[in-house]
Amino acid sequence: MELTLSLLTIFLLFFALSGRCSDKNDFPEGFIFGSATSAYQWEGAFDEDGRKPSVWDTFLHTRNLSNGDITSDGYHKYKEDVKLMVETGLDAFRFSISWSRLIPNGRGPVNPKGLQFYKNFIQELVSHGIEPHVTLFHYDHPQYLEDEYGGWINRRIIQDFTAYANVCFREFGHHVKFWTTINEANIFTIGGYNDGITPPGRCSSPGRNCSSGNSSTEPYIVGHNLLLAHASASRLYKQKYKDMQGGSVGFSLFSLGFTPSTSSKDDDIAVQRAKDFYFGWMLEPFIFGDYPDEMKRTVGSRLPVFSKEESEQVKGSSDFIGIIHYLAASVTSIKIKPSISGNPDFYSDMGVSMTWTVLGNFSAFEYAVAPWAMESVLEYIKQSYGNPPIYILENGTPMKQDLQLQQKDTPRIEYLHAYIAAVLKSIRNGSDTRGYFIWSFMDLYELVKGYEFSFGLYSVNFSDPHRTRSPKLSAHWYSAFLKGNTTFLGSQGIMQMQSNFSSSASS
């Protein structure tokens, strides 16, 4: 599948511009551009070659929901996908390893077929000049550990996670130089243990359909264990592998660009509370060795306490911060007092109400183009946490899953070029941001809404047993940008590009 544009389109890409113009070469030397997937969302082959269920398999199967049993079938089509990455011009590709494929029971024997798959995939990437960025945990711990001792609510998982990380470092570290231990630690914790809408589906909040859990305590226990597991794996890498392999180990979190819903002082204060709970909860331990004072005051005894040794181990344990960013949120202060609330949870502790900045409704929507939100996040981290190295590990916008309509994904291009420009502006303002990954490289099983909408640069025909891939307009645009054939497009240029794409597709 050739990823080329007509001479007319290239001409338009150069000259149909508006506003400030930039191209890939404006970014600092060494800055990387890539795209991303995750194991459960891309691989499929859910019961092949020794893989056992993860919590995602159980969560979706027991609820009779759409699932990732086959999804994009990356397990069988990875060589084809690497060719597409090369044609697109990616510097790097971010993916995750399925813990239950590599070590099916979560600890103990390594699955040789799972090990060989990841070796083959990584070798395929490296041999084609694509830098692998690997995430160890993307919401999908083995169901065996959940059944045995409760998974992340039990500190026993720290030892098992460290042993799993050791296998990955040992087997793949000669090719992998960038490791992210935990994906979106804050959202994994909130979704799985406060709201119960993602695995393992634990909660106690009123109106939630959970059979077990405690939203007052478990989000904080799990968050604590995630931080300790990261610190343990990071320490292992530095002691055993760093000198030989020369890689780095980071941690990622979900971020929002917060803005007050009114000009009131209460809403201004609420924005800072939201930042403390969304950012500070995970970042302050890495920088200062402890949780934000606001969280300690509000959550009180329900918030775990770091021992002196744990504080020292967590502080400074993340070589970089991975940022997952999609949209902005309008924040309103609420008056709920956790001390008098009958059932406090993460949201009542935070004391804010948030309105997501989206276009359309939540069943089929696109995110609003709000690049200021990206700038706000990067500036806040720079100012508040010592300007650590940052990789934007996910950024993108969904569109309704429609094979014909989504090929001409003009709104996605408008979104991406605005956010890439925001990253460049932040770098020029001093942010130590070193890479940017579009979510997602192709259409996948999306973890909350399944196959209702898609983020991919490439479409996947999920009705076709061969899972045929096709480039969308955004794939052509990103490829041209990466190859230095284009600059950021103005709206007129994008619309003309769409028209030209339609003409070439029908000819």
Curated annotation (Swiss-Prot):
Keywords recorded for this protein, A-Z: Disulfide bond, Glycoprotein, Glycosidase, Hydrolase, Signal
Active-site residues from the entry: 184, 394
Gene3D superfamilies the record matches: Glycosidases
GO terms, molecular function: beta-glucosidase activity
Keyword Membrane included in the entry's annotation: no
Binding site residues for a beta-D-glucoside: 41, 138, 183-184, 326, 394, 439, 455
Any one Gene Ontology BP term: carbohydrate metabolic process
Top-level EC class as recorded in UniProt: hydrolase
Reaction catalysed by this enzyme: Hydrolysis of terminal, non-reducing beta-D-glucosyl residues with release of beta-D-glucose
Protein name (record): Beta-glucosidase 3
